[in-house]
A protein has these predicted regions:
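Short loop/turn segments at strand-loop or loop-helix junctions that form parts
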Residues: 10, 35-38, 98
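Residues that cap or initiate secondary-structure elements
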Residues: 11, 29, 100-102
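Short, function-defining helix-loop hinge/capping sites that tune catalysis or transport
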Residues: 16-17, 103
Length: 172
């Protein structure tokens, strides 16, 4: 059986208030997180101190790369929890919304590198960029997390982020 992971975000910039990342599994289970400001502040501080091993041709390029890697680390955290909940996976398709800012190839390679041991059948072509319909379940879920709708959040699996885990993923 093929497991479908669909990834979207709600908000225009990862560093803005109430920015959320959503993972929809098989068009049913909703995983998500609203990134706490404390985690953003701690990771930005480490980045500014040069602790992230992020390279770039300019400061702007480094900052963009940090933004992409931070975003991808959150996606990885959501997927790790979903995979843990699902158990063994045969085949996987990963659809990433095209409104996620950044370089798709870097997101794709980070996901591939992170999950090839866990999902041996995963191929680079299984990770694609797509546009999700609006309205849709994933779009509604993004709004639910962004607005912190407590009633609707009861139907979702909320992931608590770990600063050290994100830091280690970003640095890889």
């Amino acid at each position: 059986m093929i497991t479908l992971f669909q990834i979207d975000k709600s908000g225009s910039d990862i560093f803005e208030k109430d920015y959320s990342v959503i993972l929809l599994v098989n068009k049913k289970e909703i995983y998500g997180t609203n990134i706490p400001q404390k985690i953003k502040d701690e990771l930005v501080s480490k980045f500014k101190k040069g602790e992230m091993k992020i390279t770039g041709t300019s400061e702007k390029a480094k900052k963009n790369r940090f933004r992409i890697r931070f975003h991808t680390a959150i996606i990885i955290s959501l997927m790790e929890q979903a995979i843990k909940d699902l158990g063994y996976l045969d085949d996987v398709n990963i659809e990433i919304c095209n409104d996620i800012d950044g370089h798709f190839h870097e997101i794709k390679y980070m996901l591939f590198k992170q999950f090839t041991k866990l999902i041996p059948s995963l191929k680079l072509e299984d990770i694609v960029l797509t546009k999700f319909q609006k309205p849709s379940l994933i779009d509604d879920a993004g709004k639910t997390f962004r607005k912190n709708d407590k009633e609707k959040l009861k139907e979702c699996i909320q992931i608590a982020l770990n600063t050290e885990r994100l830091y280690n993923i970003i640095r890889k």
